């Protein structure tokens, strides 16, 4: 029978009132007795609001969170075809290690699914040297029998290659890079890049005939994602942006976030316990080098990171609030052709005011139209059947030339 109680998961409950700094944190290198199994250990792990425990007990706790996320909702069918997205971050390596461990258990405890791994190469888009291919090949050997694939962000799904056949090369005709250069603001570039990445992963899943995709977002990532979605005008789809299951992808591909309940501290402890070596840190994402105030995404990320450092329980509250947002599941509503979110087709006062302001701004010094004319123009824009939601339409307006799609 499972010995890990419900209090081990989710919000910290009464622990919200505790001062984090008053607790001993970090990995205790001095030997001691595990509070769970009472075995003397040379290295104890002390998580916030939990007693110190040995490596084996900590790994059992963290892996149980992963299994509980999938098992509680029963959203992963038996023998499902799963595509795990690897980006070289600590979170994606933890997800890979947990899935591999779950696949190598005995029949009773085994997670029954067929997994493949795809590494999305983003270095060229970011203007950096290609990833260390030898490190990827070592991963594919370590986590056999998983099949490893590589695809470059911005490439066609048909360019998908097995890791053993892949050789990095600079593609001067990468259309995604040219499109990013045409977008005026970093906010628009980061938003556009995120949607393109999601669409590429969906296409790869369809090529490999995978019905489910595993992404490695943890609680702090989803808290950031929730606030960013609202700031960008994607509030209508914010619930799916932080949910365990996101079914907006085309071709009946379902996106799962099985690490959604893990914290940043648990990820770092798991990396230490398993001696994993991340290739990239969170600060190496596209556009992060431009500073905190360069985009809405950077600013929101810095805000949540500050909360995580000083008021860790607040981040959990933000994340759990996103869990409680109801999903708009009207099958009759059309979807955005770019991000697959439900179209905000109803003419709201807020959207009308935004388009009215945009019309005035574009008219500039040559403004000669009356208020009624401008309002009519704003309504016409909203009623335009371009197939884009409000947020994607905002990206379109940032383009110097060309079409978003």
UniProtKB/Swiss-Prot annotation:
Q: Name one GO molecular function term.
A: tRNA binding
Tell me which SUPFAM superfamilies the record gives: Adenine nucleotide alpha hydrolases-like
Keyword field contains tRNA processing: yes
| Cysteines engaged in disulfide bonds, as pairs | none
Q: Tell me the pathway.
A: tRNA modification; 5-methoxycarbonylmethyl-2-thiouridine-tRNA biosynthesis
In its UniProt record, which GO terms are filed under biological process? protein urmylation; tRNA thio-modification; tRNA wobble position uridine thiolation; tRNA wobble uridine modification
Keyword Cytoplasm among UniProt keywords: yes
Grouped into one coarse class, the protein's main location is cytoplasm
Q: Which UniProt keywords apply?
A: Cytoplasm, tRNA processing
* Cellular component GO terms, alphabetical: cytosol; cytosolic tRNA wobble base thiouridylase complex
Q: Which InterPro entries match?
A: CTU2, Rossmann-like_a/b/a_fold
Q: Where in the cell is it found?
A: Cytoplasm
What task does this protein carry out?
A: Plays a central role in 2-thiolation of mcm(5)S(2)U at tRNA wobble positions of tRNA(Lys), tRNA(Glu) and tRNA(Gln). May act by forming a heterodimer with NCS6/CTU1 that ligates sulfur from thiocarboxylated URM1 onto the uridine of tRNAs at wobble position.
Q: Which family does it belong to?
A: Belongs to the CTU2/NCS2 family.
What's the name of the protein?
Cytoplasmic tRNA 2-thiolation protein 2
Q: What is the lineage of its organism?
A: Eukaryota, Metazoa, Ecdysozoa, Arthropoda, Hexapoda
- The record's gene field reads Ctu2
